[in-house]
Amino acid sequence: MAATEQSLAPAGSSAPPSGKEEGAGPSSGTEGDPAGSSSTPEAPSIPDSSNPSATVPEANVKPPAAGSAALDLPIGPAPQGPAPVAEASPRSPPGPGGSRPGPETFRQRFRQFRYQDAAGPREAFRQLRELSRQWLRPDIRTKEQIVEMLVQEQLLAILPEAARARRLRRRTDVRITG
């Protein structure tokens, strides 16, 4: 619907569409229309693909709260030993020089979180919530898949070192079904 409204707007118009972004939730922030005519959140404007001269100024694009909140998270030393931690933005798409950190990296970040590093209980909750979302990805996984990940992680914790090493070498993206 927002794409239809946007195509109806004049090509030179700089007003953003007044629709609700599909992925917007309670954590995406609520900013009203500058004129105060609507209480729906402002969706970032998308350049019109038919008009090559239409560009979106960077100042109007606001990152979602969940994506920007993870940038200031403390990353402490690994309790099981030194583990390399990627310094890439957690929600950024794969770039030409690298790729998005994998679930194991996010699991380690979640497990390495220390309450003492947070500014208080609310900040600790916010950081743990963001770390768990990065690791478990509830936006793309079902509840059953999330529970399976948690059970596997707990099982790995009690396995002997040799079995754990074999399990970590195995490709988890390939599944044999029957």
UniProtKB/Swiss-Prot annotation:
Q: Which residues form the SCAN box domain?
A: 107-178
Show the ranges annotated as biased composition (Low complexity): 9-18
Query: Could you give one GO CC term from the UniProt record?
Result: nucleus
Keyword Transcription regulation annotated: no
Write down a Pfam family by its short name: SCAN
Where located?
Nucleus
Classification via CDD domains: SCAN
Question: What residue spans carry the region label Disordered?
Answer: 1-107
Biased segments, Polar residues type: 36-54
Q: What does this protein do?
A: May regulate transcriptional activity.
Instruction: Provide the assembly information.
Output: Interacts with ZNF202.
Among PANTHER family, the record links this protein to: PROTEIN ZBED8-RELATED, SCAN DOMAIN-CONTAINING 1
Name of the protein this chain belongs to: SCAN domain-containing protein 1
Species name: Bos taurus (Bovine)
